């Protein structure tokens, strides 16, 4: 296979993150790869908490446990890793959430093709200069070196052999394994090839990893060649975006930078003017918000266990870093809106689930803010008193009472040169779990024992709720706090059993009814009980609720009234669920079977066995079918028959469900026929409307559709109509004109922005030219160190770069100033060094950091360019004096 080689002066492409993603996938699709969508962050692998690598969804294939229909696939996989969470924001490239582009071969092509295509993609598609690429290989992989050197034509001095720790992949102590080869981008090839240190992240960044699975390792450690070799590759999207967009770090790419701009707008600052410490908090917020949005979108809820704890830890880290930069009010949803907007084209399910995501963010943020201030005060007190260690008991109190993840306490302690006694923390945690387990067992067993006992004494409840929503009944049993009682009073949370009831008890996926139970008390005042749930226990219906008024006594006659609105909503959702299963069988696959369901008052959820996502076109077809059946006004036929008769007439049963000899069959004539004990509408027209909200995968071979019906659709439409009305008022336009107005406004903003940037650049370049006569010449070099106030961060960077370009390779330029003369708390410093200055041992990033500290800030960057911020303009002249002193000492 011939590989076209570009000349060393080829132009590197400037591509957006979306364009990079599409270019990668299309490149491999053109070479016979099936494009597969990203798997969920919640993996179908009990050994792994979260999806941490692009290859993880294909792990069963690589291990030989599962066949893959296609021998070649390519994907962009969303991933989360938290093992380096403390480095997020502090380095240029660490993230918790990232996207991994990959191409995979399952026993098809191997090393030569993988290397050739990786090079072709890097050079021909992305336009990387070959002289900027360094290759690493496993120390014993002569085959890979021969391909890189002789087939591709890479300079042997830019092929680096590495040991097993760095360049040999394995799935575990035994199993498939093999060498890998990595492509690094060299930001400074002018520094030569004498001492290439790939761990120098100011010069090199790994952007593509090729794993050659060619061996199997047995229990004795012996390697044998695999009959079918596999390829597993990974290219970090954020890293490639940094390279192609020519920015200092991953966070300044178009994938993340809009998040930083949004954060800056919340506290009315310019991101580029900030010091390194504050920028680090911005990056933590931006990165973690991306992770949280995707975790919630994939069904994870904040909790103290497993994935839920990862989400909670990330969310609370975001809130804390928000406080560090001056944000005291809830703000997560505002950042999440931008995150969803940035990622919705690649992950449309985020848009579908945005309200769910926002609700979870609001819930968790509000919960943490309620205790954060008190927790911070306690922590501040601990920090001031602790000589070197925060005790485990104190850390546990912060965790248990104030919601501080212990990792967050560790992080804050480290910032103050302290540590947390983790052994003591774990001891306190274990003790609390022991107490909680004991208490929970006592309460749960006591309540369940009591319920079981009273049910066995009073017998089954006669359910009349199919025919009526009101019914007189008699109290057979009262349970208060797990104890069987003769009566209950105002404020008691109770469970009561009646001899008959119109309340539907939770079952068959349908939620139990809610409503009111009332009676005349002994003092003739009305007893009123709000029922919030009803469940079935051995044929008895247990009604749970709160006594709002009066006294209820065992044996009292009561009036039961089901909340008719809630019941109608549940009925509409339940019948809609039956229609949904019928539509799936008709529009997608007749072999689809139910895996589970939830029928709530405001929504429905249907889980089904299916191997792939349901397409957008199929979902649209399903909606049309269901709304068509609704408008056709089918009258339901509900009947009881023997299980054998039900099977004979073709009624669908839930696999694994136990049925009696007599079953209830719900028939929507010509559409659906199912065994079901739930409540339903009498005619499909009562449903009104049906709308699918989301379709996702929840496990291997199981998909989930969430939808709304009836009133839920009206609420959904009203919410959207409200948004349209607000936009109409803001734009002073009719609803059908809004899209055109938004497009026109965006075009106008772009045009004005270009004019503003052009004007700023013109001013900057004019000032730059006037500074050239202030250059100071030394023996073999020259420098310019000046103050330049009233110039924006972007403009001052442009000035510095222009001056270095014009002055030449032996020039060092450092400019600093207040970008806004009305703001006495902002300073920006920028340095740029020519190649000869770097060769003399100066590094712009390392040089500028200590200078910025004088102004109360910090910063850094690459050897040839760096920027920093500060908060004290009064010290700026002192900082520039130190810069001159150090330049002269180093160069003269």
Swiss-Prot record:
<dbReference type="GO" id="GO:0002161">
    <property type="term" value="F:aminoacyl-tRNA deacylase activity"/>
</dbReference>
<dbReference type="GO" id="GO:0005829">
    <property type="term" value="C:cytosol"/>
</dbReference>
<feature type="binding site">
    <location>
        <position position="680"/>
    </location>
    <ligand>
        <name>Zn(2+)</name>
    </ligand>
</feature>
<dbReference type="Pfam" id="PF01411">
    <property type="entry name" value="tRNA-synt_2c"/>
</dbReference>
<dbReference type="GO" id="GO:0008270">
    <property type="term" value="F:zinc ion binding"/>
</dbReference>
<keyword id="KW-0862">Zinc</keyword>
<keyword id="KW-0436">Ligase</keyword>
<feature type="binding site">
    <location>
        <position position="574"/>
    </location>
    <ligand>
        <name>Zn(2+)</name>
    </ligand>
</feature>
<feature type="binding site">
    <location>
        <position position="578"/>
    </location>
    <ligand>
        <name>Zn(2+)</name>
    </ligand>
</feature>
<keyword id="KW-0479">Metal-binding</keyword>
<keyword id="KW-0820">tRNA-binding</keyword>
<feature type="binding site">
    <location>
        <position position="676"/>
    </location>
    <ligand>
        <name>Zn(2+)</name>
    </ligand>
</feature>
<keyword id="KW-0547">Nucleotide-binding</keyword>
<keyword id="KW-0067">ATP-binding</keyword>
<dbReference type="Pfam" id="PF07973">
    <property type="entry name" value="tRNA_SAD"/>
</dbReference>
<dbReference type="Pfam" id="PF02272">
    <property type="entry name" value="DHHA1"/>
</dbReference>
<dbReference type="InterPro" id="IPR009000">
    <property type="entry name" value="Transl_B-barrel_sf"/>
</dbReference>
<keyword id="KW-0963">Cytoplasm</keyword>
<comment type="function">
    <text>Catalyzes the attachment of alanine to tRNA(Ala) in a two-step reaction: alanine is first activated by ATP to form Ala-AMP and then transferred to the acceptor end of tRNA(Ala). Also edits incorrectly charged Ser-tRNA(Ala) and Gly-tRNA(Ala) via its editing domain.</text>
</comment>
<dbReference type="InterPro" id="IPR018165">
    <property type="entry name" value="Ala-tRNA-synth_IIc_core"/>
</dbReference>
<dbReference type="InterPro" id="IPR018163">
    <property type="entry name" value="Thr/Ala-tRNA-synth_IIc_edit"/>
</dbReference>
<dbReference type="InterPro" id="IPR050058">
    <property type="entry name" value="Ala-tRNA_ligase"/>
</dbReference>
<keyword id="KW-0648">Protein biosynthesis</keyword>
<keyword id="KW-0694">RNA-binding</keyword>
<dbReference type="InterPro" id="IPR018164">
    <property type="entry name" value="Ala-tRNA-synth_IIc_N"/>
</dbReference>
<protein>
    <recommendedName>
        <fullName>Alanine--tRNA ligase</fullName>
        <ecNumber>6.1.1.7</ecNumber>
    </recommendedName>
</protein>
<comment type="similarity">
    <text>Belongs to the class-II aminoacyl-tRNA synthetase family.</text>
</comment>
<dbReference type="InterPro" id="IPR012947">
    <property type="entry name" value="tRNA_SAD"/>
</dbReference>
<dbReference type="GO" id="GO:0005524">
    <property type="term" value="F:ATP binding"/>
</dbReference>
<dbReference type="GO" id="GO:0006419">
    <property type="term" value="P:alanyl-tRNA aminoacylation"/>
</dbReference>
<dbReference type="InterPro" id="IPR045864">
    <property type="entry name" value="aa-tRNA-synth_II/BPL/LPL"/>
</dbReference>
<keyword id="KW-0030">Aminoacyl-tRNA synthetase</keyword>
<dbReference type="InterPro" id="IPR003156">
    <property type="entry name" value="DHHA1_dom"/>
</dbReference>
<dbReference type="GO" id="GO:0000049">
    <property type="term" value="F:tRNA binding"/>
</dbReference>
<dbReference type="InterPro" id="IPR002318">
    <property type="entry name" value="Ala-tRNA-lgiase_IIc"/>
</dbReference>
<dbReference type="GO" id="GO:0004813">
    <property type="term" value="F:alanine-tRNA ligase activity"/>
</dbReference>
<dbReference type="InterPro" id="IPR023033">
    <property type="entry name" value="Ala_tRNA_ligase_euk/bac"/>
</dbReference>
<dbReference type="InterPro" id="IPR018162">
    <property type="entry name" value="Ala-tRNA-ligase_IIc_anticod-bd"/>
</dbReference>
């Amino acid at each position: 296979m011939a590989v076209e080689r570009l000349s060393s002066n080829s132009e590197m492409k400037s591509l957006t993150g979306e364009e990079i993603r599409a270019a990668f996938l299309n490149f491999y699709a053109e070479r016979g790869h099936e494009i597969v969508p990203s798997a969920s962050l919640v993996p179908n692998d009990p050994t792994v908490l979260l999806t941490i690598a692009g290859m993880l969804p294909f792990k069963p294939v690589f291990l030989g446990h599962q066949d893959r229909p296609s021998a070649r696939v390519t994907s962009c996989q969303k991933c989360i890793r938290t093992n380096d969470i403390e480095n997020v924001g502090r380095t240029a490239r660490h993230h918790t959430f990232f996207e991994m582009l990959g191409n995979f071969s399952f026993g098809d092509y191997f090393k030569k093709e993988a290397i050739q295509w990786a090079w072709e993609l890097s050079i021909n598609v992305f336009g990387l200069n070959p002289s900027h690429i360094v290759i690493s290989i496993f120390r014993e992989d002569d085959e890979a070196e021969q391909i890189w050197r002789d087939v591709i034509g890479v300079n042997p001095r830019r092929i680096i052999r590495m040991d097993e720790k760095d360049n040999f992949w394995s799935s575990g102590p035994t199993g498939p394994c093999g060498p890998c080869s990595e492509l690094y981008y060299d930001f400074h090839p002018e520094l030569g090839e004498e001492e290439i240190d790939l761990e120098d992240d100011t010069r090199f960044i790994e952007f593509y990893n090729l794993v050659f699975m060619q061996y199997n390792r047995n229990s004795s450690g012996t390697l044998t060649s695999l009959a079918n070799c596999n390829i597993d590759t990974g290219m970090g999207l954020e890293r490639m975006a940094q390279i192609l967009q020519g920015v200092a770090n991953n966070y300044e790419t178009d994938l993340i930078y809009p998040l930083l701009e949004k954060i800056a707008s919340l506290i009315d600052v310019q991101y580029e003017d900030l010091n390194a410490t504050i920028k680090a908090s911005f990056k933590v917020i931006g990165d973690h918000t991306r992770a949280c949005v995707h975790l919630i979108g994939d069904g994870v809820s904040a909790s103290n266990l497993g994935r839920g704890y990862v989400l909670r830890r990330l969310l609370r880290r975001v809130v804390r870093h928000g406080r560090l930069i001056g944000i005291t009010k809830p703000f997560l949803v505002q950042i999440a809106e931008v995150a969803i907007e940035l990622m919705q084209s690649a992950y449309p399910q985020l848009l579908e689930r945005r309200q769910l995501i926002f609700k979870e963010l609001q819930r968790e943020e509000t919960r943490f803010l309620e205790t954060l201030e008190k927790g911070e005060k306690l922590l501040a007190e601990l920090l001031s008193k602790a000589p070197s260690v925060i005790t485990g008991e104190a850390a546990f109190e912060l965790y248990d009472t104030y919601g501080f993840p212990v990792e967050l306490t560790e992080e804050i302690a480290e910032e103050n040169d302290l540590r947390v006694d983790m052994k003591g923390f774990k001891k306190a945690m274990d003790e609390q779990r022991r107490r909680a387990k004991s208490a929970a067992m006592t309460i749960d067993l006591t309540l369940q024992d009591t319920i079981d006992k009273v049910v066995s004494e009073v017998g089954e409840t006669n359910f009349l709720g199919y025919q009526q929503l009101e019914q007189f009944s008699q109290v057979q049993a009262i349970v208060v706090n797990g104890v069987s009682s003769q009566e209950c009073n105002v404020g008691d949370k109770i469970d009561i059993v009646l001899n008959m009831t119109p309340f539907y008890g939770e079952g068959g996926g349908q939620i139990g009814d809610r409503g009111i139970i009332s009676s005349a008390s002994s003092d003739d005042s009305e007893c009123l009980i709000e029922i919030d749930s009803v469940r079935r226990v051995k044929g008895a219906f247990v009604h749970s609720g709160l006594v709002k008024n009066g006294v209820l006594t065992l044996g009292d006659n009561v009036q039961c009234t089901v909340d008719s609105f809630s019941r109608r909503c549940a009925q509409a959702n339940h019948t809609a669920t039956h229609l949904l299963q019928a539509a799936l069988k008709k529009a997608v696959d007749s072999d689809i079977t139910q895996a589970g369901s939830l029928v709530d008052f405001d929504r429905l959820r249907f889980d089904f066995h299916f191997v792939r996502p349901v397409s957008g076109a199929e979902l649209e077809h399903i909606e049309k079918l269901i709304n068509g059946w609704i408008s056709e006004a089918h009258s339901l036929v509900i009947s009881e028959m023997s299980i054998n008769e039900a099977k004979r007439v073709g009624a669908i049963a839930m696999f694994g469900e136990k049925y009696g000899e007599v079953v209830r069959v719900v028939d929507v004539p010509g559409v659906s026929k199912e065994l079901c004990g739930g409540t339903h509408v009498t005619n499909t027209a009562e449903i009104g409307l049906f709308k699918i909200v989301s379709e996702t995968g929840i496990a291997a071979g199981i998909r989930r559709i969430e939808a709304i019906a009836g009133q839920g659709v009206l609420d959904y439409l009203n919410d959207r109509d409200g948004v349209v009305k607000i936009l109409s008022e803001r734009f002073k336009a009719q609803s059908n004109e809004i899209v055109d107005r938004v497009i026109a406004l965006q075009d106008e903003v772009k045009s004005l922005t270009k004019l503003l940037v052009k004007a700023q650049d013109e001013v900057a370049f004019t000032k730059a030219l006037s500074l050239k006569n202030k250059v100071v010449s030394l023996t073999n070099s020259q420098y310019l160190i000046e103050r330049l106030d009233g110039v924006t961060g972007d403009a001052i960077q442009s000035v510095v770069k222009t001056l270095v370009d014009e002055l030449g390779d032996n020039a060092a330029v450092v400019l600093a100033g207040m970008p806004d003369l009305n703001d006495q708390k902002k300073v920006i410093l920028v340095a740029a060094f020519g190649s000869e200055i770097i060769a003399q041992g100066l590094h712009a990033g390392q040089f500028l950091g200590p200078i910025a500290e004088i102004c109360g800030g910090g910063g850094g960057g690459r050897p040839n360019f760096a920027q920093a911020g500060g908060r004290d303009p009064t010290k700026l002249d002192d900082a520039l004096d130190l810069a001159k002193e150090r330049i002269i000492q180093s160069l003269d």
